[in-house]
């Protein structure tokens, strides 16, 4: 009987050692996820530890000051976004992990902003939404679309997460559509809804490939061309009209032209030599609203190139001689000095080029002197 006592003690010690080993090497529990509102105070308990337990707190691996503790509890006041992180409390002596909290600081959602538009009429329309202020934590959106009392499918956009598409089931319907959206997160929820007629949300995309060119030999004209938006599915059955605006860069005031058809227009009142900016908008002929303005095109009206004229005064001098380098005109006769001094009369100053009429007048004067 006495020999059985040591065996009993060994069994107890082995069980205790196994319990300690299991506690130290067992997988750590996942941290508790907690959401708190920005600007509030929060108290984080150290799991099941008693209030007076000796513990140490860390956030993201950095020790926290002891004056933040109330017993074993961590007190965080006036929460800021920077308070978000992984908080852990440890037994002060053994550094055994007692508890972990993954804290997220954020805000409940405000009323979402919702809008719907048909840029592919008559195929369908899309709705998009966003929050007017960030929440800093994950949000979940839920959209419902009603056509009268009939629920319609809103297909998620593959590229834009805050957009979905609805196909028109009954074209030219007079029944209103109602679109509602709700948003929720860990701190709250909010909703909004809009009701509209089919034709009121028709708004094409802006015209594409707007090009402006000068018109040769016309200093006040610009030729503007553009294309119907590629997203407009049937321009033959549902034609668009266009609105063109233009101005010189030196002025702030726009000039406007509305065009019922066609994808070209010639501006006839441009300022010569001034650069212009031109934009075009589109709208269904009957319903809806105008598109946004297109990408701006720039152009300057045609200007005549300056002519480079060379005059005798502008021609560079190539000699210091007083003799002209230009050929004499057809009425000019080149005379010999000896011809003018023959007959004993007074000598006429030497000229390299004397008109025939002057020569005849001089000869007559000489003959008259001889007769006297």
Swiss-Prot record:
PROSITE patterns: FN3 (PS50853), HEMATOPO_REC_L_F3 (PS01354), IG_LIKE (PS50835). Glycans are attached at residues 60, 70, 142, 190, 261. GO terms for cellular component: apical plasma membrane; ciliary neurotrophic factor receptor complex; CNTFR-CLCF1 complex; external side of plasma membrane. The keyword Cytoplasm does not apply. Its main location: membrane. Residues 1-22 form the signal peptide. Residues 311-326 have a biased composition (Low complexity). It comes from the Eukaryota. It is found in: Cell membrane. Residues 108-205, 206-306 form the Fibronectin type-III domain. A lipid is attached at residue 342 (GPI-anchor amidated serine). PANTHER family: CILIARY NEUROTROPHIC FACTOR RECEPTOR SUBUNIT ALPHA, CYTOKINE RECEPTOR. Binds to CNTF. The alpha subunit provides the receptor specificity. Forms a heterotrimer with LIFR and IL6ST. Interacts with heterodimeric neurotropic cytokine composed of CLCF1/CLC and CRLF1/CLF-1. Either alone or in complex with the heterodimer CLCF1-CRLF1 interacts with SORL1; this interaction may promote internalization and lysosomal degradation. The WSXWS motif appears to be necessary for proper protein folding and thereby efficient intracellular transport and cell-surface receptor binding. This is Ciliary neurotrophic factor receptor subunit alpha. It comes from Rattus norvegicus (Rat). The gene is Cntfr.
